[in-house]
């Protein structure tokens, strides 16, 4: 199940297409198959749940957070909690988090803060910044 979860994570389009509404795979945002620090790595996220989610104003489990990724980040629909997709992804995250302290806010969790720009907003400059820093995860058209 761990390998299946990794497969879903790196090739979501192939293994979970019916739940995805855009062209993304999980690893488009969670780099290096969910292992890279400062790109919301699974090893740091898994041990941080359950946690309050402002998006739905409740305390969610890690599995529920994964379901929300399908709905919000991937513009799709949430797989059922007992679906092999969710079970596989949770199993993979659990394996990556082996040895991590539960409840700790680990260094490298989440994404780094982006500093406020020194210049006022500009559409052309913004398009250039988006192309260089954002399109890899969010696609050419966001």
Which residue ranges define each predicted feature?
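Post-cleavage N-terminal segment of exported redox proteins
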Residues: 1-7, 11-12, 51-122
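Sequence/structural segment immediately N-terminal to covalent heme-attachment motifs in c-type
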Residues: 1-35, 117-142
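Short linear functional motifs in flexible/disordered or boundary regions
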Residues: 17, 38-41, 78, 101, ...
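Gly/Gly-Pro-rich "capping" loops immediately C-terminal to redox-active cysteine motifs
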Residues: 17-67, 141-142
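Intrinsically disordered, low-complexity N-terminal regions enriched in serine/proline/glycine
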Residues: 45-48, 91-93, 129
């Amino acid at each position: 199940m761990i390998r299946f979860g990794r497969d879903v994570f790196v090739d979501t389009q192939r293994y979970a297409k019916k739940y995805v509404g855009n062209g993304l795979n999980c690893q488009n945002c969670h780099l290096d198959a969910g292992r890279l620090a400062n790109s919301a790595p699974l090893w740091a996220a898994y041990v941080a749940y359950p946690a309050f989610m402002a998006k739905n104003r409740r305390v969610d489990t890690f599995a529920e957070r994964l379901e929300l990724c399908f709905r919000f980040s991937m513009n799709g629909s949430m797989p059922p909690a007992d679906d092999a997709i969710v079970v596989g992804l949770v199993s993979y995250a659990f394996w990556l988090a082996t040895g991590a302290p539960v409840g700790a806010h680990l260094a490298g969790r989440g994404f780094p803060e982006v500093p406020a720009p020194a210049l006022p907003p500009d559409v052309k400059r913004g398009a250039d910044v988006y192309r260089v820093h954002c399109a890899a995860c969010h696609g050419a058209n966001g």
